[in-house]
């Protein structure tokens, strides 16, 4: 990953960065995509559909199928179908999906930092 010159005053470069950020967030948008990605990271091995479904509380089959298809289309998840009876289908992160790891960790760290800041501000207001 390269260092960005965040003080860049080139409007074209700023637009390129904004567009890239929007594209990345589009891939991750929705309630379930990040949960699916986190489950696949945590598993450290391919998961069958039923295993994913069991690991994710409150997701229905239709939504899981839809989200997996979108993640597959975006190159984040790969679906492997084994030619056997009964059919066996597994899902795993692609190289592009694995490359999301540091960004996901940075988002998690940022979210915890932000949450802690709000907690501290609430405590100050109570006093």
What are these regions (language model features)?
Residues 2-6, 38, 99-127:
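Amphipathic alpha-helical dimerization/coiled-coil segments
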Residues 19-63, 90:
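N-terminal helix-turn-helix DNA-binding core of bacterial DNA-binding proteins
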Residues 83-107:
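Basic, amphipathic "hinge/linker" alpha-helix immediately C-terminal to the N-terminal HTH DNA-binding motif
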Residues 49-82, 86:
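Canonical helix-turn-helix DNA-binding module
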Residues 1-28:
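N-terminal leader segment of winged-helix/HTH proteins
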Residues 15, 23, 46, 53-55, ...:
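Non-catalytic interaction surface on structured domains
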């Amino acid at each position: 990953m390269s260092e960005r010159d965040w003080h860049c005053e080139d409007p074209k470069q700023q637009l390129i960065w904004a567009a890239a950020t929007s594209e990345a967030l589009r891939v991750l948008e929705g309630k379930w995509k990040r949960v699916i990605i986190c489950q696949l990271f945590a598993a450290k091995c391919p998961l069958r559909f039923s295993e994913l479904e069991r690991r994710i509380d409150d997701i229905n089959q239709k939504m899981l199928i839809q989200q997996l298809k979108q993640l597959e289309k975006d190159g984040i998840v790969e679906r492997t179908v084994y030619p056997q009876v009964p059919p066996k289908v597994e899902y795993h992160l692609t190289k592009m999906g694995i490359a999301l790891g540091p960004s996901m960790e940075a988002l998690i760290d940022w979210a915890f930092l932000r949450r802690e800041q709000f907690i501290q501000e609430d405590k100050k207001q109570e006093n």
